[in-house]
Amino acid sequence: MGFLTSNTAAPLQPRRSPTTMAAGAFYLPKESKKRPLGEDAHFIFPEGQTIGVADGVGAWSFHGVDAGKYSRMLMSKAEASARSQAGGGVNPMKALTDAYAGTNVLGSSTACILTLTDDGVISAVNVGDSGFAIVRAGSVEYKSPVQQREFNYPFQLGRGIWSDRPAVAARIKVEVRPGDVIVMATDGLFDNVKDELVAELVGGGADAPGKVAERLAKEALKIAKSKDVETPIALEARKAGIEYSGGKYDDITVIVAYIEAAADQSGTIAVNLGT
């Protein structure tokens, strides 16, 4: 069962930035009668040019805790913080810190929050193995680094003694330009789909971002259920000395955001050609 968010590719408020971001998302939770919402969460805040994903750590289920409640509250609080900042530009680190401070349920979660600044730069914070990639001209130009202590043990926000605080977050700034495509996702995508296939499935930008997110998520699910496909997680497992083949069945959240030339107040497209 898939949960398609409302596509937010509608025109945004005029801004001084040379670029703007239009985003859509698709979520495929693992099939579970006990936890039908899964353990992933996300938000899209178009007016603030900000998106975020979180992945609740499933090991909490062994203690009777639904980590999805943690990730959902974390993203809800992050969006609320972003909205409170929107007038002066969103600081993703503040959004993450505010979200952590306001999340008061048991559990832990990875998290990634990203905003497009007024100078056309992606500013992001990332904790754990969720993250984002920038697709440019048919290939992955940049991918956020994974934070983990060992194979399949990512950094994670939480209150437990084994959990992390927002200060551990990687702080990332990357210049983007019109035509770039941001793919933000939980590890349900990146564990299963190679970078080359991500870029191929993104295509040339003809489809709405929510449709591209759906395509990526469904491909990840297909690979996740395979036992003989060479996958990123299988490669990483073997590097760690663990025999592993095929994909990893998991919740899958994908947000796709198109970077576009922004229009000024008169409707004129503002394009910085550089030098």
Where is each model-derived feature located?
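PP2C/PPM-type serine/threonine phosphatase catalytic domain
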Residues: 1-275
